[in-house]
Amino acid sequence: MNGALGKVLCLKNDTIFKQAFSLLRFRTSGENPVYSAGGILLTTSRHYRSKPTHGIGRYKHLVKPEEPKKKKGKVEIRAINVGTDYEYGTLNIHLIAYDMALTESYAQYVHNLCNHLSIKVEESYAMPTKTMEVLQLQDQGNKMLLDSVLTTHERVVQISGLNATFAEIFLEIIQSNLPEGVKLSVREHTEEDFKGRFKARPELEELLAKLN
């Protein structure tokens, strides 16, 4: 009986020494015994430096940094392309209507059509809105009364390098798809067309004239 008890004590002491030796080996190698094979101890200390949810919900590292906005400079006049015997120079496609949404939509259609047909589009812009008052003469008397106010919207699609042989086909396409109520006109680009893009400021011009 004493011999069997001695063997059990020896085995128990042997396992304790092995566990202590493995713990000492983990400590000297810098390895955490809790998460290693054969670990026998549990620790209540936090193994992370911050909160468990630290970093969750961050998205700024996924978004590209925004580029600084460039200041809009003054629009300068470009050199006008005169054209050759085989192709037109700079042409302006004017679209005029009373409905702004219809004018804008058809201007986009013409722009996309030019891109599809490999026609170079220099730029697409809006002209200043024009208003016209309609006056009505009374049945009795010479006094004029305001009947309505008509607002005219204009969009311009500027193209260049249109082939002379293809020009007739191109104009026929945009004219056949012209919506009702939209006026179409195509003419060569001039310096007056460039100046007409901007609203006149007579007061500012007078002040500049006085300063100069």
Curated annotation (Swiss-Prot):
The keyword Ribonucleoprotein applies. Keywords: Mitochondrion, Ribonucleoprotein, Ribosomal protein, Transit peptide. The modification N6-succinyllysine is found at residue 199. It is found in: Mitochondrion. Its main location: mitochondrion. InterPro entries: Ribosomal_mL48 (IPR027487), Ribosomal_uS10_dom (IPR027486), Ribosomal_uS10_dom_sf (IPR036838). Residues 1-28 form a transit peptide. Pfam families: Ribosomal_S10 (PF00338). One of its GO terms (cellular component) is mitochondrial inner membrane. The keyword Disulfide bond does not apply. It comes from the Eukaryota. Component of the mitochondrial ribosome large subunit (39S) which comprises a 16S rRNA and about 50 distinct proteins. Interacts with OXA1L. Belongs to the mitochondrion-specific ribosomal protein mL48 family. This is Large ribosomal subunit protein mL48. The gene is MRPL48.
